[in-house]
UniProtKB/Swiss-Prot annotation:
Entry-annotated residues carrying 4-hydroxyproline: P10
Compartments it resides in: Secreted
Full protein name: Chi-conotoxin-like Ar1311
Tissue: Expressed by the venom duct.
Keywords (A to Z) from UniProt: Disulfide bond, Hydroxylation, Neurotoxin, Secreted, Toxin
Molecular function terms from GO: toxin activity
Signal peptide location: none
Function noted in UniProt: Chi-conotoxins inhibit the neuronal noradrenaline transporter (NET/SLC6A2).
GO cellular component: extracellular region
Organism: Conus araneosus (Cobweb cone)
Keyword Nuclease (UniProt): no
Length: 11
């Protein structure tokens, strides 16, 4: 999952 701008990590 991507959170923010081009920052993909488990949220």
């Amino acid at each position: 999952r991507c959170c923010g701008y081009k920052m993909c990590h488990p949220c």
